A protein has these predicted regions:
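ATP/NTP-dependent adenylation/nucleotidyl-transfer catalytic domains that generate, transfer
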Residues: 17, 187-339, 387-388, 393-418
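A broadly conserved sequence feature marking short terminus-proximal activation segments
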Residues: 137, 145-165, 300-355
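A short secondary-structure junction signal
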Residues: 139-145, 169-174, 182, 186, ...
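ATP-dependent adenylation/nucleotidyltransferase module used to activate substrates
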Residues: 1-176, 364, 403-418
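Immediate flanking context of iron-sulfur cluster ligation sites
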Residues: 177-191, 341, 347, 369
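Short linker/helix segments within small regulatory modules
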Residues: 186-189, 363-378
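Short cysteine clusters
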Residues: 103-104, 194-197, 347-353, 357, ...
Length: 418
């Protein structure tokens, strides 16, 4: 408790804007919250629950209980949630996978960042999260420090008060202090995260399905929907889902969700074709530079130079062309330029780019994208691979058409779990 208080005092002097307990409803976060509320004044920190919409039903009971407890103790409790339901995002991104785990960014990280911005009124806030991470949980976590600077989001600190605790110490503390314990654990579950997770062990999946069959099967149905039509028979699809083959997905080749983006080279030009783009490219182009002309051929001034390109719009089809010589001479510009049109094609305004922007330049209110003049062209909204999580999730391997449903995998191991 003393270490928590000393860390709070030290980092408050360093300019941390907001301290908060990253609350998940699990046993570790319940203990962490109890330690923090004993160590710090109740008006000096917040409790933040990232609601993915895929939590165990017992977790929601836990969160409701803790929220009432916080209200009684005058501790600010914040629920952060994506504007999209999991059923909506799974249908647009395809089911998450071990490598392609877009769900954490869309349903957890981005909503939390946006909620803290709203709570603090600061776009580029510095936060410190008290997290219930323990070194004994995994090899990776055994290398964590008590306090570390987050890699995922600039300027966000993590403090791990129970890093050196083992499970026995954790449960002993819970029962000795009469803390609320998520009922998921008493039913045999070792974890209380998302019901269906590509990183979950087979044992975890078994208990989750036994305990919460209705909610679990709803998510499994979403996985089936994403792959229907790809398998020769229902039996093969059943085997694929049951064996966890969906967890091994690395791209969009096997999904029945088609991309509206095509890229090719014709007559020494890079050609990009987008059918029914979801967002306005003239908004996204602002993130890489300043558009200097109002009609095609366009010129964009960037930190890599000034470049000319053409855009044709007809019957819902956007055709972009750029001299192939630029592709070879300005690879850094080309990466960002392609990202602009990846976003144009498939952005659903999931909020990740908005959260990544520390200048508050990206706005996505009421389903409309707007990028204002505070944009510094820092490229933080392009840090996601390929510039867009939807594009990355649905992208086909080179040589496989994104518009063709009939492409099948030749990899006999592609339907098995990692």
């Amino acid at each position: 408790i003393k270490q928590i208080y000393n860390s709070f005092v030290k980092y408050r002097k360093k300019g941390v804007d907001v301290f908060y307990v990253a609350f998940s409803g699990g046993k570790d976060s319940v203990v962490t919250l109890d330690l923090v509320q004993k160590a710090l004044p109740h008006n000096s920190f917040k409790v933040l629950f990232g609601d993915t919409g895929m939590e165990f039903p017992d977790t929601y009971e836990t969160v409701d209980y803790i929220e009432k407890q916080c209200q009684r103790d005058n501790i600010a409790f914040i629920r952060a949630k994506s504007k999209y339901k999991p059923s909506e995002t799974w249908a647009k991104f395809g089911p998450p996978a071990t490598v392609n785990r877009w769900c954490c960014s869309v349903h957890k990280t981005a909503p939390q960042i946006l909620a803290l911005r709203e709570a603090t009124g600061i776009h580029d806030f510095t936060g410190m999260a008290f997290i219930g991470v323990r070194a004994s949980e995994s090899v990776a976590r055994s290398g964590y420090d008590y306090i570390s600077l987050g890699e995922k989001h600039k300027g966000q600190w993590s403090c791990n008060p129970i890093l050196d605790w083992n499970s026995a110490e954790l449960y002993a503390y819970i029962y000795s202090e009469n803390l609320y314990l998520n009922k998921a654990y008493t039913k045999g579950n070792r974890r209380a995260g998302c019901l269906v997770c590509p990183r979950a062990a087979e044992r975890s999946d078994y208990f989750a399905r036994k305990c919460y069959p209705k909610e679990f099967d709803q998510l499994i149905s979403a996985i089936r929907s994403g792959y229907e039509g790809h398998f020769a028979s229902e039996a093969n699809l059943d085997q694929f889902v049951t064996n966890g083959g969906w967890k091994a997905r690395k791209n969009g080749r096997d999904l029945n969700i088609l991309s509206n983006y095509e890229e090719m080279e014709e007559s020494r030009k890079l050609i990009i074709k987008i059918t029914n783009p979801r967002t306005d490219w003239k908004q996204w182009i602002k993130t890489i530079g300043i558009l200097q002309s109002e009609a095609s051929p366009y010129c964009v001034e960037t930190k890599h130079g000034i470049f000319e390109f053409e855009v044709e719009e007809s019957d819902g089809i956007l055709k972009i062309s750029l001299d192939s010589a630029i592709v070879k001479s300005a690879p850094n510009f080309i990466k960002l330029f392609k990202n602009v049109f990846h976003k144009t094609a498939l952005c659903i305004r999931c909020g990740v780019c908005e959260a990544d922007c520390h200048n508050g330049a990206i706005h996505m209110e009421n389903g409309v994208l707007r990028i204002d003049d505070t944009c510094k062209h820092c490229s933080m909204c392009h840090k996601v691979e390929r510039g867009c999580l939807v594009f990355k999730s649905l992208e086909r391997p080179k040589g496989v058409s994104s518009m063709n449903k009939k492409n099948k995998s030749l990899n006999c191991y592609s339907h098995h779990a990692p």
